[in-house]
Regions:
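Acidic, proline/glycine-rich low-complexity IDRs
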Residues: 122-154
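A short, highly charged nucleic-acid-interacting micro-segment common to nuclease
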Residues: 12
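Short recognition patches in nucleic-acid-associated and regulatory proteins
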Residues: 1-6, 17-52, 67-87, 93-130
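Cysteine-rich micro-motifs
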Residues: 43, 51-67, 135-145
Length: 154
């Protein structure tokens, strides 16, 4: 099943089809994670909470004591960037994701990716990196507020 190379080592509960794949993110078997962002979490009306980009940039990374592990960076991930064979950009400042509802810093993260047809994707050196859409869901482990963002990557 297709998954981006950066996500593959942390993917759990993988499910999907040739064109759409969903996975939870786990670190050492744990799904309660500290997340670093270039972006923001916004509370919305009627539970429509959002994960928003900071300008044109959204970066999501796992926080670890020995360094953050990028899961998604809108500047270099996805179909258009794989097509252009873009190199990783300079590091960007990240900040801890904090739930705006309860101020908790632990989240469960689910990612979904949409891919073009198999024939088109097979032309890439790393087909899993050639996704056209990503859906990110971050659920606070304390108050269970869910923050969602979807981004085009083509």
């Amino acid at each position: 099943m297709l998954l981006p190379a950066a996500v593959r080592p942390y993917a759990a509960d993988v499910d999907g089809t040739d064109s759409r794949v969903r996975c939870a993110i786990a670190l050492n078997g744990l799904k309660d994670l500290r997340i670093q962002l270039c972006g923001r979490l916004k509370r919305g009306l009627f539970g429509r909470n959002q994960l928003l980009a900071d300008g044109d940039v959204l970066c999501v990374a796992l926080h670890q004591p020995d360094g953050d592990v990028p899961l998604f960076d809108s500047r270099c991930d996805g179909y258009a960037n794989a097509l252009d064979d873009r190199q990783p950009p300079a590091p960007i400042p990240l900040h801890p994701a904090i739930c705006p509802k309860c101020r908790n810093a632990a989240f469960q993260v689910d990612l979904s990716f949409e891919y073009p047809d198999a024939e088109e994707v097979s032309a890439f050196a790393n087909p899993g990196d050639a996704f056209t859409w990503i859906w990110i869901s971050m659920r606070c482990t304390r108050c269970h507020a869910v923050f969602r963002g979807d981004f085009t990557a083509d």
